[in-house]
């Protein structure tokens, strides 16, 4: 947007797509799948200077995101003081509402209206992925979906005779690219970059008497939705998606925010009074972004990258060097048995020095109890990498 405003470029085409469902079907049907390699970077490329996770996290949680987000979810559940059963129902009802929206979305991938119990209760069709998340809590990236949008100046739109009815205006955006491994974040559920980027948008809205009334909160996993909702101070009862969310509408990898933005622009075209706020995430709730849209150019567009501010104020917590000792659990999950490992718990703790450590447990009684009562906040003993 800033490049268009400055005259550096006249227009930009933003495209995203995913054909993973086609790839999946080719595998199932033993057919060849042809994939075109992308060997060049986009014009604007932000390369991460830090890793998404530390070695201990990768060793026990792997590279899939679900375990990391499940640990964040446990921390948020404890912060909200919800019991295990209350939390199951809360997430089930939130995502049941999402499924209803996806069912009426002509572009939605799963157009089925689920009851909250269908989502909350694990079974063969909705297996546990990482406690407390079942399959229907998780983003669905096995989709065939594509989307595109064009950004240009009013001057070019006039030259091309683009009808006013089709024009939507970006009002403001913000982002943070500050990276801290999940376990090293001072506050697991309130990262500073998220707070600063959200505050920038909220301040613009407050100063200009703009009130967002339509939301699309990034929904790779339920904890992301809740963290965005809290940061934006959204009142209970508001719809938090226009697509139906990534579990049901579809979650094409690396391009969902384009899809969700296009859907938001359609919503604003159909109802000119809507002011839309779209959010995005990268990594393990590592980076966040916000974009504010409206039918009219209510204010001059502005953007802020809060990365440097966040880097200066939020530092990673040290990893514990203790081989044996006591600690307090700050988050946990239980991963189901897979091809390479048995069912196990992955536990984040803070030791008596205030440093962080990743622990594991294979104790079946502990694993069972972790799904029945809250373990966040418990004082525990450890030896090496194991819960003692």
Per-region residue spans from a language model:
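C-terminal capping/lid segments that line or modulate ligand- or cofactor-binding pockets
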Residues: 287
């Amino acid at each position: 947007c800033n490049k268009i405003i400055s005259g550096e470029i006249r227009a930009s085409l933003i495209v995203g797509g995913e054909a993973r469902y086609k790839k999946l079907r080719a595998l199932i049907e033993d057919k060849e799948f042809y994939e075109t390699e992308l060997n060049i970077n986009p014009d604007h490329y932000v390369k991460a200077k830090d890793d998404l996770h530390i070695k201990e996290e990768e060793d026990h949680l792997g590279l899939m995101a679900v375990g990391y987000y499940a640990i964040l979810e446990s921390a948020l559940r404890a912060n909200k003081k919800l019991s295990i059963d209350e939390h199951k129902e809360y997430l089930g009802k939130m995502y049941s509402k999402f499924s209803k929206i996806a069912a009426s979305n002509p572009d939605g991938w799963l157009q089925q209206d689920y009851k909250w119990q269908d989502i909350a209760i694990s079974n063969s069709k909705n297996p546990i992925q990482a406690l407390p998340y079942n399959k229907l809590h998780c983003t669905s990236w096995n989709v065939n979906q594509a989307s595109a949008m064009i950004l240009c100046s009013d001057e070019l739109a006039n030259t091309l005779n683009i009808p006013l009815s089709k024009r939507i205006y970006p009002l403001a955006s913000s982002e943070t690219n500050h990276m801290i491994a999940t376990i090293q974040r001072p506050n697991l559920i309130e990262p500073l970059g998220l707070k600063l980027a959200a505050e920038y948008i909220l301040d613009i809205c407050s100063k200009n008497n703009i009130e967002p009334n339509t939301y699309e909160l990034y929904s790779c996993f339920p904890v992301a939705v809740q963290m965005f909702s809290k940061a934006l101070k959204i009142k209970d009862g508001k719809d938090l998606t226009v697509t139906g969310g990534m579990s049901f509408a579809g979650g094409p990898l690396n391009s969902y925010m384009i899809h969700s933005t296009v859907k938001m622009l359609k919503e604003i075209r159909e109802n000119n009074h809507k002011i839309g706020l779209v959010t995005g995430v990268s990594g393990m709730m590592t980076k966040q972004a916000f974009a504010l849209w409206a039918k009219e150019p209510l204010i001059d567009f502005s953007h802020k990258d809060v990365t440097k501010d966040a880097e200066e104020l939020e530092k990673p917590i040290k990893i514990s060097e203790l081989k044996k000792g006591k600690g307090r659990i700050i988050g946990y999950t239980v991963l189901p048995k897979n091809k390479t490992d048995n069912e196990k718990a992955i536990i984040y703790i803070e030791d008596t020095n205030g440093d962080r450590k990743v622990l594991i447990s294979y104790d079946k009684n502990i694993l069972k109890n972790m799904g029945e009562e809250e373990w966040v906040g418990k004082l525990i003993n450890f030896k090496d990498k194991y819960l003692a």
